[in-house]
């Protein structure tokens, strides 16, 4: 199949096709190999993980998204109005790929960090509400009281962090559960 023909199939059909190929490969594996494969899946926590539904707002932990591409995928696959919590303090990340998607789906951007200049310059005029906070706890509070009904609060850093995704994800989940 040519790349041109594949491109006309659409993203959903391509993903479905790839899933079918993987399903066929999985059927050919032995049970013990499958158990081992699925046992390792627990290690992929904090990737599009539902945390809680509070006052009509769903909180989603995507702390494992340490790149623009991973965050793009998550935003693309999240329906409804999005309140995006992103990490600042990284002035080297190129967010340009996220701009068209953010324009369509993100209603509020909460920037966590001491220097959020890059996030502001990348999304000013694209996302209607952009605020700065210092901690993930403050970000969760701001999202909860944003006034955006039926929103999905998405914690997706979009940039590498000195702290591990595991630590960031645990902090986010803990703060949500403290609401």
PLM regions and their residue ranges:
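ATP-dependent carboxylate-amine ligase
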Residues: 3-12, 19-30, 36-179
């Amino acid at each position: 199949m040519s790349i041109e023909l594949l491109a006309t199939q659409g993203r959903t059909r391509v993903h479905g096709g790839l899933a079918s190929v993987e399903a066929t490969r999985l059927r050919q594996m032995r049970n013990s190999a499958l158990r081992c494969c699925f046992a390792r899946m627990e290690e992929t926590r904090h990737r599009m993980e539902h945390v809680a539904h509070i006052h009509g707002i769903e909180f989603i932990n995507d702390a494992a998204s340490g790149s623009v591409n991973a965050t793009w995928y998550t935003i693309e696959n999240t329906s409804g109005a999005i309140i995006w919590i992103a990490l600042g303090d990284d002035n080297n990340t190129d967010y340009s790929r996220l701009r068209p998607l953010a324009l369509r789906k993100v209603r509020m951007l909460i920037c966590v960090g001491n220097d959020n200049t890059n996030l502001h310059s990348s999304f000013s005029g694209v996302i209607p509400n952009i605020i700065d906070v210092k901690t993930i706890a403050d970000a969760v509070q701001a999202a909860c009281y944003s006034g955006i009904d039926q929103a999905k609060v998405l914690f997706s850093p979009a940039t590498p962090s000195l702290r591990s995704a595991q630590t960031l994800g645990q902090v986010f989940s803990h703060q949500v559960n403290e609401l």
